[in-house]
């Protein structure tokens, strides 16, 4: 497969520049006959989850296609689902560059992107143009300059605008790169947010005559007690699914490596065990009451199977996809 050569060239570039260059090429082919260049035939392995039928259990995690610019090209590679975003009500530039770093030896990434995106209206226009036949998740967050106390309003604005176009909606309250965001995972703040989101979901269901499930994305850095509280809140509010996990602030597995001290969330292989352990504990706590989408360091069939054995119904990749390329999709879907 050609990807090792492509990767070698891309890894000569700054990580964000490599991402921009790749997306420039994907934008050129998305929705055109040239999509055949990236198309892969993968077996159908349907999974029912959150009331939806996924054509296979492997999805693309949020963060790669923030604005939904390359949905069709990414879909052609064989993903059973694609989660676009995180998107916010208003466009925002994100944090200062550089803000994305490779830990090549660990096959990890550190990012402090800060929800850079072109805003929800732009994303909706891109979704309208897409022809992807898998499940499209849309991941939403709050603008950096929205006070945390008013954060729920940003989620409700996004929900209203994307509801008609989303297969499911992911609520991102676990990015470490938006000040105060992770506080929404706890206690009263979480209950308040989930109440508002569930009420909005009910209103939108009545308006659009369709039910769009809601999944909440959580951090891997929760204590045992916090995890129990989160699980309890999700069940009490009838949330449809949980995505576990986002990136970690823990650096214990990458000490001494180049870029290890950069601020931001660590993803990729160093997150693998930590996220699997959260999934296992969450699964025990939830006891089948809502499904788990497992994400964090999946870079092989074995890693994907470990997430499913720990209790995940579906899995997603991001960093592994950067390091291994499209062949990883085919390998996981074929052998999982």
UniProtKB/Swiss-Prot annotation:
Pfam entry (one): DHO_dh
SUPFAM superfamilies: FMN-linked oxidoreductases (SSF51395)
EC identifiers of the protein: 1.3.5.2
InterPro entries associated with the record: Aldolase_TIM, DHO_dehydrogenase, Dihydroorotate_DH_1_2, Dihydroorotate_DH_2, Dihydroorotate_DH_cat, Dihydroorotate_DH_CS
Protein residues bound to substrate: 66, 111-115, 172, 177, 246-247
Reactions that this protein is recorded to catalyse: (S)-dihydroorotate + a quinone = orotate + a quinol
Entries under PROSITE patterns matching the protein: DHODEHASE_1, DHODEHASE_2
Swiss-Prot/TrEMBL cofactor(s): FMN
Catalytic site positions: 175 (nucleophile)
Keywords: Cell membrane, Flavoprotein, FMN, Membrane, Oxidoreductase, Pyrimidine biosynthesis
GO terms for MF: dihydroorotate dehydrogenase (quinone) activity
Its membrane topology: Peripheral membrane protein
GO terms, biological process: 'de novo' pyrimidine nucleobase biosynthetic process; 'de novo' UMP biosynthetic process
NCBIfam families found in the cross-reference section: PRK05286.1-1 (NF003644), PRK05286.1-2 (NF003645), PRK05286.1-4 (NF003646), PRK05286.2-5 (NF003652), pyrD_sub2 (TIGR01036)
Subunit structure: Monomer.
HAMAP family reported in the protein's UniProt record: DHO_dh_type2
Function: Catalyzes the conversion of dihydroorotate to orotate with quinone as electron acceptor.
Protein name as annotated: Dihydroorotate dehydrogenase (quinone)
Species, as recorded: Escherichia coli (strain SMS-3-5 / SECEC)
Gene that encodes the chain: pyrD
């Amino acid at each position: 497969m050609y990807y090792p050569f492509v990767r070698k060239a891309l890894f000569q570039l700054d990580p964000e520049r490599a991402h921009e260059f790749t997306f420039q090429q994907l934008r050129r082919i998305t929705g055109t006959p040239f999509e055949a260049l990236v198309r892969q035939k993968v077996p159908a392995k349907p999974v029912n989850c959150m009331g939806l039928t996924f054509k296979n259990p492997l999805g693309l995690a949020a963060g790669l296609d923030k604005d939904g610019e390359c949905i069709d090209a990414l879909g052609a590679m064989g993903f059973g689902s694609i989660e676009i975003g995180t998107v916010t009500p208003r466009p925002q530039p994100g944090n200062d560059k550089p803000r994305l770093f490779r830990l090549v030896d660990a096959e990890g990434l550190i990012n402090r992107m800060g929800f850079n995106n072109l805003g929800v209206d732009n994303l909706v226009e891109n979704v309208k143009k897409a022809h992807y036949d898998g499940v499209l998740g849309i991941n939403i967050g709050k603008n950096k300059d929205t006070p945390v106390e008013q954060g729920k309003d940003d989620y409700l604005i996004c929900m209203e605008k994307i509801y008609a176009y989303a297969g499911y909606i992911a609520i991102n309250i676990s990015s470490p790169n938006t000040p105060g965001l992770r506080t929404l995972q706890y206690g009263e703040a979480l209950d308040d947010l989930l109440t508002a989101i569930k009420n909005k979901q009910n209103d939108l269901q009545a308006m659009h005559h369709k039910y769009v499930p809601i999944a909440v994305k959580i951090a891997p850095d929760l204590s045992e007690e916090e995890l129990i509280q989160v699980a309890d809140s999700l069940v009490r509010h009838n949330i449809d699914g949980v995505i576990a996990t986002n990136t970690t602030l823990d650096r214990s597995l990458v000490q001494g490596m180049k870029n290890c001290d950069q601020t931001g969330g660590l993803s990729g292989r160093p997150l693998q065990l930590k996220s699997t352990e959260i999934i296992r504990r969450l699964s025990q706590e939830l006891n089948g009451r809502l499904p788990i989408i497992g994400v964090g360091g999946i870079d092989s069939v074995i890693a994907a199977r470990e997430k499913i054995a720990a209790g995940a119904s579906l899995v997603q990749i991001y960093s592994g996809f950067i390091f291994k390329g499209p062949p990883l999709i085919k390998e996981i879907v074929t052998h999982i």
